[in-house]
């Protein structure tokens, strides 16, 4: 690949990284899972290096069904609300993923859409009250929410 093309690809990757925001939905691989998963960016650090994300599942896992504190943190999304969904699905706000934001700038992750303002607010509220994030992490990922 030519140096000019490599530079152009790097610039596009940086542009994509600069535009990622809470509510953005990506489809990509997940370690240990045999199919692609939908990820929702729930919060982004002020320096745009770190992010907090959650998964969309096609059904609620039996493990979660037996745990009321986790079950109450599942947000139902209807397929008629989002073009990227083919059936009713559930946002798992009981198990946040913390990673580098550039995780989603990888070419293996495809942008699929964005949650409505109401749904991203619900996701963020569920995460903030989940007990899965420290106060420092809440302040880092959700400074404009608190």
Question: Model segments located where?
Answer:
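Mixed-charge, Lys/Arg-rich low-complexity intrinsically disordered regions
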Residues: 1-19
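Membrane-targeting and insertion segments and their boundary/processing signals
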Residues: 9-13, 63-67, 93-97
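Short, functionally important structural connectors and interaction interfaces within domains
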Residues: 12, 67-69, 107, 125
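A general structural signal for short secondary-structure junctions and capping/turn motifs
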Residues: 17-18, 31, 81-84
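Compact nucleic-acid interaction/catalytic patches
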Residues: 27-30, 34-79
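C-terminal terminal-subdomain/extension
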Residues: 74-146
């Amino acid at each position: 690949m030519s140096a000019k093309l490599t530079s152009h690809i790097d610039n596009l990757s940086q542009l994509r990284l600069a535009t990622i925001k809470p509510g953005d939905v990506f489809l990509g691989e997940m370690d240990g899972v045999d199919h692609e998963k939908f990820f929702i960016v729930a919060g982004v650090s002020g320096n745009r290096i770190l992010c907090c994300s959650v998964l969309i599942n096609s059904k609620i896992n039996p493990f979660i069904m037996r745990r009321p504190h986790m079950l109450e943190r599942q947000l139902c999304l209807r397929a008629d609300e989002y073009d990227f969904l083919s059936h009713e699905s559930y946002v798992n706000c009981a198990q946040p993923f913390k990673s580098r934001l550039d995780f989603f700038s990888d070419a293996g992750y495809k942008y699929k859409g964005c949650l409505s303002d109401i749904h991203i607010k619900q996701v963020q509220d569920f995460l903030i009250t989940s007990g899965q994030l420290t106060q420092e992490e809440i302040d880092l990922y959700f400074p404009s929410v608190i």
